[in-house]
């Protein structure tokens, strides 16, 4: 991305990152990922409970002191929880999960924690050539290409957060030899 309004810094040292933020005075900072950031003043490896806690605390203090919005990205494990210490979830104002399947172009943004708003909302997006685009009508997307009166199918309304979504349900039933 070539833009005079975007600065990318490849840095894992907390002190160097904070110095760059103070020098550049950005409106928004994105840290990807907090598990790779380390404070050299601590005798623990990056990603440890103490490192994640101290690095997050330093970013929070800088953000609040300078009025900067900070997005802290954390890795998730196979179970879908934020990898490493749970302390990160308790420190931040909002926890969002960006979910998707590598075999489809659709992604869901789901709020798991929000100190300033609802957590029962989702956003559905599609990865396109221009980037992520909102899917304004998920029901239409889920039902597109569905033949009318297809045997063994029906449309069901399910709630995804506070949003009703229409989806196709399929079932095949056959009689068995035992009746």
Located regions from the model:
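Active-site phosphate-binding and catalytic loops of NTP-dependent enzymes
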Residues: 4-5, 64, 81, 98, ...
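Short regulatory helix/loop adjacent to the ATP-binding pocket of P-loop NTPases
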Residues: 81-91
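Short glycine-/polar-rich loops that comprise or flank the Walker A/P-loop
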Residues: 4, 67-68, 90-94, 105-107, ...
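Short, ordered loop/turn segments at secondary-structure junctions
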Residues: 12-14, 33-36, 42, 65-68, ...
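Conserved inter-motif catalytic segment of the P-loop NTP-binding fold
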Residues: 1-61, 176
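Conserved P-loop NTPase
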Residues: 22-29, 35, 100-179
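Substrate-engagement module of ASCE P-loop NTPases
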Residues: 50-75, 91-102
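Short glycine-/acidic-enriched loop or helix-start segments at secondary-structure transitions
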Residues: 18, 40-41, 81-83, 107-108, ...
